[in-house]
A protein has these predicted regions:
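Non-catalytic accessory segments of hydrolases
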Residues: 1-166, 190, 432-445, 455-463, ...
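Serine-hydrolase-like catalytic core of hydrolytic proteins
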Residues: 74-255, 303-324
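Active-site rim elements
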Residues: 78-80, 161-166, 229-234, 299, ...
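Non-transmembrane alpha-helical segments in soluble domains
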Residues: 107, 173-176, 180, 206-209, ...
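Substrate-access "cap/lid" subdomains that shape
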Residues: 181, 215, 224-339, 369-391
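C-terminal, loop-rich substrate-recognition/catalytic regions characterized by aromatic stacking residues
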Residues: 307-354, 486-519
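Alpha/beta-hydrolase fold catalytic core
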Residues: 348-392, 397-402
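Mobile gating loops/cap/lid regions near enzyme active sites that modulate substrate access
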Residues: 379-519
Length: 519
């Protein structure tokens, strides 16, 4: 295979509203990386950033600082990378097939990591080159402020900090405005923009649907494992206590001094106070702040009628955070009795007797013991989301990614195992490779996402006919070895598991996230 690379003094160059950017072309895709779309003082609103001359957009920009320490990554199902961090993190990346006047769909990727960590460049599975190359679309990914830098409400300390609790969202809105004003020069259609994100990225899609300033800047959305509630819900109430303790921990006498504290010291102080504040019921600066700018989590507050017409795909993986249970067993070597005994040992006799027949009915293709690696947290929140949103429209579809990883005798799909299938990049993760299966399911998922991005309807020739869900009639497309649409198939099973175990699962997830961001 011959792959062409091109980089000239005058090509490829695009003159944006901020200044000229210089990228490169490789293998029929034109890349622009690290384009600054804004800059901001700490805790303050983003502002336009301009430059003279030509900006070299050939390397990823800074990601938002976090409290995490760099660590080696040993995963076989992702393609993790390290990145540089700085508060000047408002930058975006663009992949396009051509710099022409053709109006291609624009897909804007919002990275995962809750609202506290992550970046647009940390996972090679989420790079937009293959999506661009094989889907003939324009792909954009972006970085924005996170954690205390993006979501610490300091509005009690002055008008300058009025929206400090939502600056992460404000950055995303600013980026979407930049895309609206510039993407046509990159071969994209500003009137056909799809937001998509996984985990925290999906949460960002739900947040932008609840943000009036984002209205008109996007036209459809894909929410992957991103409908979350419980311990992950809104920061309600004033962040004044957080600000006071941060100043105390950093030795600052006023908010202006806090704005100048070295970022590592600031985030270190946040590590000390965040978990204590969370469980005392105070705003801990980790999620969007309910206000007239952001109108709240739709599982708690009303869905906005202004965005109810926007088509959505909403889904999750079969296993999510419960999938690691699969690591410790060889399920294909177990007898039915051994599976039932394991379920009874783990769940107790009463719960096991209820869920075993329900699981057999919902997932007849799966070994019975997989009920222990089945997600019921994300699925519960998605079902609540679907019930509420389908009362407002007929343009919301739900899916479940149900393909095991071919390792350790078959591991239920983890949180994020659908990423490579959406981006058409499964070849970058060894543990996703199963001959004759991976390519089939990748084509089904990828074609579905491309159809949805182009038309607002996910139906295409690679999947069965799939109608949007309606109240009381929920039709989930279950991607797997035998992809099929299933109607109202897991409600009783999910309610049974969640009713007994949801609170523990939410706490487990919260503790896992806290461990990563220093809670």
């Amino acid at each position: 295979m011959v792959r062409k690379f091109r980089y000239e003094n005058d090509y490829p160059i695009v003159d944006t509203t901020c200044g000229k950017v210089h990228g490169y072309e490789y293998d029929d895709v034109i890349y622009f990386k690290g384009i600054p779309y804004a800059r901001a003082e700490r805790f303050c609103d983003p502002k336009a950033y301009t430059w003279d001359g030509v900006f070299e957009a050939t390397a990823y920009g800074y990601s938002c600082p976090t409290i995490e320490e760099p660590a080696l990554d040993y995963s076989l199902d992702f393609a993790r990378k390290q990145e540089l961090k700085d508060e000047a993190c408002q930058n975006l990346n663009i992949w396009t097939p051509a710099l022409d006047n053709e109006k291609r769909p624009v897909l804007v990727w919002l990275h995962g990591g809750g609202m506290s960590f992550g970046s647009s460049s940390e996972d090679g599975l989420c790079e937009g080159d293959n999506m661009c190359r094989f889907g003939r679309v324009v792909v954009v990914s972006l970085n924005h402020r996170l954690n205390l830098l993006g979501f610490c409400d300091l509005s009690d300390f002055g008008e300058k900090f009025k929206n400090s609790g939502n600056q992460g969202i404000a950055d995303m809105v600013f980026a979407l405005k930049w895309i609206r004003d510039n993407i046509a020069k990159f071969g994209g259609d500003p009137d056909n923009v799809m937001l998509f994100g996984q985990s925290g990225g999906g949460m960002k899609v739900t947040a932008l649907l609840q943000t009036p300033e984002a209205d008109g800047l996007f036209h459809k959305g894909l929410i992957m494992s991103g409908v979350q509630g419980g311990a992950m819900c809104d920061c309600n109430g004033s962040g004044k206590k957080m600000g006071e303790i941060l100043m105390e921990e950093t030795g600052c006498s006023n908010i202006e001094e806090l704005c100048k504290v070295p970022v590592k010291e600031l985030l270190g102080a946040g590590k000390i106070v965040r978990k204590k504040l969370k469980f005392l019921g105070y705003n801990a600066g980790e999620m969007p702040f309910y206000s007239d700018y952001y109108l709240g989590d739709p599982l708690i507050h009303p869905f906005r009628s202004e965005t109810a017409h926007i088509p959505l795909l909403v889904g999750s993986t079969f296993g999510e955070f419960n999938a690691p249970f699969s690591y410790g067993i060889s399920k294909h070597r177990m007898t039915d009795k051994e599976m039932e005994d394991k379920i009874k040992e783990t769940l107790g006799e009463d719960l096991a007797s209820k869920v075993i027949p329900l699981f057999k009915e919902a997932y007849p293709e799966r070994p019975l013991v997989d009920v222990l690696s089945m997600d019921y947290m994300f699925r519960s929140y998605i079902r609540s989301y679907m019930k509420r949103r389908t009362e407002l429209n007929d343009c919301t579809w739900e899916y479940i990614f149900n393909l095991d990883m071919p390792m350790l005798g078959g591991v239920s799909p983890l949180h994020g195992n659908d990423l490579g299938f959406v981006f058409n990049t499964t070849d970058r993760a060894p543990a996703l490779q199963e001959p004759g299966v991976t390519e089939k399911v990748q084509k089904e998922v990828f074609d579905t996402v491309m159809a949805f991005a182009k038309t607002g309807n996910p139906n295409n020739g690679s999947i069965p006919a799939w109608e949007p869900s309606k109240p009381g009639d929920f039709k989930a497309l279950v991607f797997g070895k035998e992809t099929a649409v299933r109607r109202n198939f897991d409600a009783e099973l999910n309610d049974c598991m969640a009713g007994e175990l949801l609170e523990k699962q939410v706490q487990f997830m919260y503790d896992s996230v806290s461990g990563r961001i220093g809670g």
